[in-house]
Amino acid sequence: MTERFDLVIIGSGAGGGTVAHTLSETSARILIIERGGFIPQEAENWSPQAVWGEQRYRASERWLNAQGKEFHPYTHYCVGGNSKFWGSVLYRL
């Protein structure tokens, strides 16, 4: 790649997308790097059962918690990030 950018944003979710939108109003050359691709346009996208019940787009990887126990995080790698699946809603803890 021979192109040069002023800024690189990692991820296009809520944070990265907001930063990219704000910076798009400047003269900066911006590159967004996303781990996943676009979610396919298909009927299953509109089915809560397919998306949530069958976890159609959920990543298959496993993580380890602080005790070293394996768990399957509810995460997605796609353009728009997890925000696409959470409807841009973030709950306070």
Task: Identify the meaning behind each predicted range.
Residues M1-L93:
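N-terminal glycine-rich phosphate/pyrophosphate-binding loop and immediately adjacent elements
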